[in-house]
Amino acid sequence: MARSTARPVVKLKSTAGTGVTYVTRKNRLNDPDRLVLRKYDPVAGEHVPFREER
């Protein structure tokens, strides 16, 4: 069975400018805009917003 195109893999990049990335899936139907999640950045040592890369 093929993977769904409605839930693509997206890269989340730290807004702190450290170059740290997370990889996750998102539902395009529910979240058509860029995804922003607050996650831990080990280089910065704190929780920062991670924004979806295009």
UniProtKB/Swiss-Prot annotation:
Family: Belongs to the bacterial ribosomal protein bL33 family.
InterPro entries documented for this protein: Ribosomal_bL33, Ribosomal_bL33_CS, Ribosomal_bL33_sf, Ribosomal_zn-bd
BP GO annotations: translation
Cross-referenced PROSITE patterns: RIBOSOMAL_L33
Keywords from the UniProt entry: Ribonucleoprotein, Ribosomal protein
Organism whose genome encodes this protein: Streptomyces coelicolor (strain ATCC BAA-471 / A3(2) / M145)
Molecular-function annotations in GO: structural constituent of ribosome
Any Gene Ontology CC annotation: cytosolic large ribosomal subunit
Name used for this protein in its record: Large ribosomal subunit protein bL33C
